[in-house]
């Protein structure tokens, strides 16, 4: 039996306090009917004795305390899931916004999900091709991994996100592959960019989009990634699909958490963010993975903008603790016209060695990856030295490494947002660039690989 109350005592921002309640649960869904008959939704955020704090999804403007009815629905916020969601666009609460028909759900699922038993997790080990050389060749994405992209304000992370969503695929089998894309707190122009890109390129045919705009309520922003991950879990673990989940921008999500925390008058943590920011982010990131005995998988690419390009900011800092690496976008490379401006030296995929090699990419992948990293680092050092002391201070080997670093930026990194390179094309390009380095300096590659692959590039 649904419980109704007219004992609203206080409304502060997106929060409502109701007194005299009993028998309700944390995260329970609430329906609020205003004095005009308008219905709004919320969820139970906190219970203290007979007082309940409710988070309003549509805001509190125009609510009259005396004439407002609060109805507790006895269930959490749910998403109706179906394979028909593929190819559709939804708002942050799971409502269709693409003028298509309503989804007839196969079932309704609690958006908070349930944690994967660590014992039942399967270790990520299969390669996912994104078509971007700096990721595929040097910071390989593995099926079931969570690999964030750290960007900055004004950097083209939206272009990178759209490129990955458009190009990503699983090699070696005909398994069903889908992309679940969730955007939080983005502008109308950004939303239109993503929708147009997915539609024009045909990527929408294998994608599910959840769009939360900057002028939508902050509470909806908190629900958006959970809606997306609930959809992904259904497609992966019940329909056997390999799902790539792209979440952007987690900084907007964290700002919404801070806004709600401030309204609740909680004691703030670092930079004013709530003390449970780490726990909250981990509840999102840890929903990636593979389960033993089930064919599907969830791979996550969260994208966040670092305030003032500060990688020690709480959001990227905590994200780095939870996830398995990071892809860094560089403002220096962006100003140089490099597209996409991925800076490979601080970037890292902690699981890359599990998804490369014979039978997955190619036998020479690990050796060339290590040599390219070493060569690029040496080349950047040589270029910096030349700026101070001049080219005459460089040895022949230093000059070769400097030339390699220059070519690497121009040809390997700077592939543009429309170029889709296969992993074999990426590996062959790496060998082509390594030609400028004397063979004696290729100390990280086995001789048999040099004889087999470098000879073909001469």
Swiss-Prot record:
Disulfide bonds: none annotated. It comes from the Bacteria. One of its GO terms (cellular component) is proton-transporting ATP synthase complex. One of its GO terms (molecular function) is ATP binding. GO terms for biological process: proton motive force-driven plasma membrane ATP synthesis. Keywords: ATP synthesis, Hydrogen ion transport, Ion transport, Transport. Pfam families: ATP-synt_ab (PF00006), ATP-synt_ab_N (PF02874), ATP-synt_VA_C (PF22919). PANTHER family: V-TYPE PROTON ATPASE SUBUNIT B. Produces ATP from ADP in the presence of a proton gradient across the membrane. The V-type beta chain is a regulatory subunit. Belongs to the ATPase alpha/beta chains family. This is V-type ATP synthase beta chain. The lineage of its organism: Bacteria, Fusobacteriati, Fusobacteriota, Fusobacteriia, Fusobacteriales. The gene is atpB.
